[in-house]
Amino acid sequence: MVECIFCAIVEGRAPAEVVFEDGETLAFMDINPANPGHTLVIPKQHVRNIYDLDDEAAAAVMRATVRVARAIKKALQPDGMNLVQSNERAGGQEIFHFHMHIIPRWYGDGLRLARPSEVRRTMAIKEAAAKIRGEIAKEQD
């Protein structure tokens, strides 16, 4: 089994520029930043992706993300910010430990988030919404 680099960072066995830590989460600088200040927020417990993330860990990661995003806003004064979270290879996930990217943005920074040039629709919006609502309703039963 390949070792999880993020778990090694949490355990102090791999280096990282840590900017925030609490009992449940860790935030550190991305080693391949899309822009200056690009930061990752992770749960300390190994969780592969959003599908495996429990509600408590999700809340902890979001609390830490908000706190770090506010600090980035004050420290670096970006014009905006992207929060990015990818799941599985098809979704662009490269490290299989849940993580949130906080990417500061400036006008003219040239950074583009991938998006097809024309909208590709395999099902109508209403049909997709109905299927999603159906799955959410199943969870509440």
Predicted regions and their residues:
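HIT superfamily nucleotide-processing domains
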Residues: 1-141
